[in-house]
Amino acid sequence: MSDMNAHISEWMKETEESPIVMSSRIRLARNLENHVHPLMFPSEQDGFRVINEVQDVLPDLDLMRLDTMDQQNKMKLVAKHLISPELIKQPASAVLLNKDESISIMINEEDHIRIQAMGTDLSLQDLYNIASEIDDTLDQSLDISYDEHLGYLTTCPTNIGTGMRASVMLHLPGLSIMKRMNRIAQTINRFGFTIRGIYGEGSQVYGHIYQISNQLTLGKTEDEIIDNLTEVVQQIINEEMQIRERLTQYNELETLDRIYRSLGILQNSRIISMEEASYRLSEVKLGIDLGYLTLSDFKFNELMVSIQSAFIYNDEDETISVNEKRANILREYTQ
């Protein structure tokens, strides 16, 4: 069973944090024949029937029905990237999770089924193999919507075809500081890729963290999408590394000032917003990656989750604000 109070999933603890690649994800969107799409369910019972059908095929995964959860626990799942903010809005929705939470299957978001396989490093092909195996299991027992000319049929036209979204989460402080991200976004957009915020489409960028993903799925195979995205991501990584080298060679004093100012704020602030905290943490991580800082308890990925309101807020203790609690946590982990 998923631990709602664990700040990061077990799969994220298995490897050392990378300087740039935070995580990779493969998502497959699937719909069921003879069911209206989730956004058009006549009643909640239609949604619960879909949940039961999917759960029956995958009994080894833990089911969490969102209608039985409070808002704070729902937001914890969002913070850990196990569900999307959109899933919360659906009255009859659920998520299936494996033990280490590297597999997350959203039920009744925009589509009936969204299979997610998540991992560290640039492991897109391995993750696709995992997601594809689950997809095959579902396909053997359920009537999946598929057209021999178009491919998998999805609610959003941009997902029609393979129904696959491949994405990589990158920490790019160098490119952000040098204001290169708009140019990169325009360039990769011409090749069918996009840059989004930390929680996908329409979300805000926090802590110089960007999600790079494919935009279209029609007309390309899964392998082509994965290969092309991997190449694009590798080029962005190379450019980030070049910028970091330039920051140390030609702008070292300014870079050190930026890093140590952020460290000082994290070590001494008494109240701090999520937005400011994320950027200060990003610059401290940059300092660690460049070899300027050594902080034994500093874990960027985990801190970026644990300082979110869902993990801080306690309605039984209203004497201390979320921003104050956040500052207390950050002082503890940046000494």
Curated annotation (Swiss-Prot):
InterPro entries assigned to the protein according to its UniProt record, in alphabetical order: Arg_Kinase, ATP-guanido_PTrfase, ATP-guanido_PTrfase_AS, ATP-guanido_PTrfase_cat, Gln_synth/guanido_kin_cat_dom
PROSITE patterns: PHOSPHAGEN_KINASE, PHOSPHAGEN_KINASE_C
Binding-site positions, ATP: 23-27, 81, 114, 165-169, 196-201
Enzyme class of the recorded protein, top EC level: transferase
Keyword presence, tRNA-binding: no
GO-annotated molecular function: ATP binding; creatine kinase activity; protein kinase activity
Database matches in HAMAP family: Prot_Arg_kinase
Family classification: Belongs to the ATP:guanido phosphotransferase family.
Name assigned to this protein: Protein-arginine kinase
Species in which this protein is naturally found: Staphylococcus haemolyticus (strain JCSC1435)
Lineage of producing organism: Bacteria, Bacillati, Bacillota, Bacilli, Bacillales
Gene name linked to the record: mcsB
